[in-house]
């Protein structure tokens, strides 16, 4: 059973406004040492199971949404439009107006301190993200991107194998979400590439590359590590109108939060 449970809307607000709280709760699996994980046999082509971000393993010195310990992290290479959008998004987040029921999108789901489950089938890999109950399909049947691709929050993803590396190409985003909780923007032009490698029995490494010439002056990369949580199950964290109403009453209408009526620029 999961040992990291959000028990109230107040806790939800803490995650959204002060996301560092849950990070210390990510732990090694009970009874499994690092040496055990490295020596235990595994299939490099098997990503099935529940995975959780491993904040203490994330590389330093690069853009890293999980590194919230007071370390100054570099920002991505914004284009002028991206810099302006980021500043607008940041004001929106600082004002506390960050809760809605829109899907997080693929990138932000990966960079949220909540687990996700991979379910592998013959022709696709399904991902179930715990937070907001978001789902993603990665097609593995050799198809190409549709000519009439409809923009969507989660995009359209196609995967292929390069040896023991699983390469995922995603496009078709609608540009309505953030890449990260800090408000890094994206547009409908964004292309997201992921390179998955299972490093040992318990460790999954994913290198994310973002190409979006409207928002960024050049492609940029984030490397993330995830730990296999064999004894966990996903909790239910759907977004509901009741949750938004309570969040708004407790947080957005609080006198100590400036700019609670602030709306982001379109």
How would you describe each model-predicted region?
Residues 3-5, 9, 20-266:
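PEST-like low-complexity, intrinsically disordered acidic/proline/serine-rich tracts
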Residues 12-18:
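Hydrophobic core
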